[in-house]
């Protein structure tokens, strides 16, 4: 059998740094029956494709475009996938704030990690009942927590996905009126009394 090499950029940014998030994606797909994912600001984080058959990636960076243009990346995904179907991977070399050529409400999952306020401009592509997986590195989880279109349904931490004590999250440490404008003007996360590494919101409207 042909040995499939780990793509260099993926190895550098995710394998070597221990940031593949395999456990998170495995649990997400099992618990929420996810078959399609949109990942804006992905750079070269292809781990979702190991667990989800249809993946659409969006990033402005030129190295990301070169990465996804390389046929060996899809070969690597095929070598690590955990489902029977053929992997379907699409990449858009553009800003996630611009419209992409995908139907509205066509994805089971939208991912927001380290690329700013992703949830607001991309939620149009998320199905009602679909989920947003988001961290709070740039304040996007905080933004989702006050968005009427989203409802917090789980968090992810060292013990895995949990649905316990969700009302204890997104309570500001300081007495601050948290609004969309406040978070966007700040451009980063604020301090909360209880936190998780990732938050899972269901799109309810």
Label the model's feature ranges.
Residues 20, 41-45, 113-118, 136-139:
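Short beta->alpha connector loops
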């Amino acid at each position: 059998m042909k040995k499939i090499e780990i793509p260099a950029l993926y190895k550098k940014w995710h394998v070597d740094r221990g940031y593949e998030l395999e456990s998170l994606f495995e649990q997400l797909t099992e618990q929420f029956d996810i078959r399609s994912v949109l990942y804006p600001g992905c750079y070269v984080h292809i781990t979702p494709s190991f667990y989800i058959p249809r993946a659409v990636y969006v990033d402005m960076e030129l190295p990301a475009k070169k990465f996804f243009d390389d046929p060996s990346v899809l070969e690597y995904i095929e070598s690590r996938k955990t489902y029977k179907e053929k992997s379907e991977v699409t990449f858009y070399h553009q800003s996630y704030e611009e419209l992409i050529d995908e139907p509205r409400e066509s994805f089971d999952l939208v991912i927001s990690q380290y690329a700013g306020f992703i949830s607001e401009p991309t939620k149009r592509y998320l199905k009602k009942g679909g989920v947003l997986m988001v961290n709070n590195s740039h304040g996007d989880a905080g933004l989702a927590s006050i968005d009427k279109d989203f409802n917090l349904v789980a968090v992810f931490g060292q013990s895995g996905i949990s649905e316990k004590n969700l009302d204890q999250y997104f309570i500001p440490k300081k007495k601050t009126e948290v609004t969309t404008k406040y978070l966007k003007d700040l451009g980063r996360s604020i301090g909360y009394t209880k936190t998780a590494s990732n938050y899972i919101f269901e799109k309810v409207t």
